[in-house]
Amino acid sequence: MSKPLCSTGLRWLWLVVVVLIIDLGSKYLILQNFALGDTVGLFPSLNLHYARNYGAAFSFLADSGGWQRWFFAGIAIGICVILLVMMYRSKATQKLNNIAYALIIGGALGNLFDRLWHGFVVDMIDFYVGDWHFATFNLADTAICIGAALIVLEGFLPKPTAKEQA
């Protein structure tokens, strides 16, 4: 017997759509208004800077000849499938986990779209202190990191008792 989708964690899939719209919209604006390498200061220690990332986080494997595009696309698809199954198996009331999974899926799909459509991931957020610059990243990366942090946080929270779960 199948359970109603609204009673599962899939009820939180709307958050995936929100992350995708914000991420892809921000990347579209960068592509339309910036040339590669352009930088605009927003605040002290924060710039918009158009960069292309052919690898993964911190440009890992960026100069590997192209195979990494498909490797990272496969990883993103696999992670999305696993998290969707986990959302389906969880209750809609397990908010923290489901929000975390939705943020990770939305971020992974945003970067997957870039890899498949452009052949690279559009990055634009440049955080710096003095002359030191953190790796340029995008809103999809931010969603993935927030989702991962929520999963870690959930591990430290007290588990509900059997009575509370009923």
UniProtKB/Swiss-Prot annotation:
- What subcellular compartments does it reside in? Cell inner membrane
Q: Do you know which PROSITE patterns this protein is assigned to?
A: SPASE_II
Any one cellular-component term (Gene Ontology):
plasma membrane
The record gives the membrane topology as: Multi-pass membrane protein
* UniProt keyword annotations, A-Z: Aspartyl protease, Cell inner membrane, Cell membrane, Hydrolase, Membrane, Protease, Transmembrane, Transmembrane helix
| Residue positions of the active site | 123, 141
Q: Answer whether the UniProt record assigns the keyword Protein biosynthesis to this protein.
A: no
InterPro entries cross-referenced by the UniProt entry: Peptidase_A8 (IPR001872)
For this protein, the parts annotated as crossing the membrane are: 12-32, 70-90, 102-122, 137-157
Q: What does this protein do?
A: This protein specifically catalyzes the removal of signal peptides from prolipoproteins.
Show the HAMAP family listed in the entry: LspA
NCBIfam families assigned to the protein according to its UniProt record, in alphabetical order: lspA
Please state what the protein is called.
Lipoprotein signal peptidase
Give the species. Answer: Salmonella paratyphi A (strain AKU_12601)
Q: Which gene encodes it?
A: lspA
